[in-house]
Amino acid sequence: ERERNRTSNRIELSNQQTQTERKMERYFKLTEETIVNEAGRKLRQIECIRDFKFAHAGELGGFIEKEENLGGEAWVDEEAQVWGEAKVINGSVLRGNARVYGHATVKNGSVIYDEARVYDYALVDGCFVGGQAKVYGKSWLALGVTMADQAEVFGLASIESSSCLLHNASVSGRACLNYATVLSTDAYVTRNFDCCQFHNLCPEAGITSVYRTKAGDLRVYHADEVYTLEAFTELIERADSESIFKQVYPAVLAVIKARFEL
């Protein structure tokens, strides 16, 4: 009988602890303020109920469809929205007019901002997506990727390791990019063979990226500028003969031509 009482007390104490933990974990509530969004979904505004990293108690946030859309001290600012089976979790935040929906997951301190969209089954893990960028399909971003402007990632593509997509860069298919890849204007990458890069070859540029466009020709991203291959060749030819750029980049040009079978 004593053992039964001890067991009962332990269970009761465990239940009380679980309820307390849940109460401590809860940091927002759904308000009665509702909207019907552009997708025809009825969403409810959230309100912060205790101070944490992104909001203070009583502060209103954005709109979500259900409590399961948000967790782990993640937050949605006033104009941002989450719906469907999508989840924004683990200290991530939506700002501006960002939208996350479908079965997408945004986690581990990611920031989705401006007019950015993450949807379908996409995963954004510890990354920054802004501008009018889109991440969709079954694609995923991880480990500090930055997307901006009108960049898109979709299909089964994966990008990681502080890579950066700018302007109208597009990555799709089964492309798998890492090692701080930088893609910019007119990039159209559907497989790994569509791009390559060179690191720390001269003081002017930490990264020189070469990639295909949708038309099939090449662009070179170097020192924050984008060149056609012809223009980049001229840049090398005009360089000071004493510069590291002049000494190193003719060899880089030869590698580019061999790599892309020119």
Pin down the residues of each PLM region.
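Low-complexity, polybasic segments enriched for Lys interleaved with small residues
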Residues: 182, 186-189, 193-206
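Terminal amphipathic alpha-helical/low-complexity segments used for targeting or macromolecular assembly
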Residues: 16-73, 79, 103, 132, ...
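Residues at the loop-to-beta-strand transition
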Residues: 68, 74, 80, 86, ...
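General helical structural elements
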Residues: 6-10, 14, 103, 121, ...
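N-terminal compositionally biased, intrinsically disordered segments and leader/signal-like regions
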Residues: 8, 19-21, 32, 106, ...
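Short, Lys/Arg-enriched N-terminal segments with co-localized hydrophobic residues
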Residues: 1-23
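Terminal low-complexity, poorly structured segments
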Residues: 9-12, 26, 161-162, 173, ...
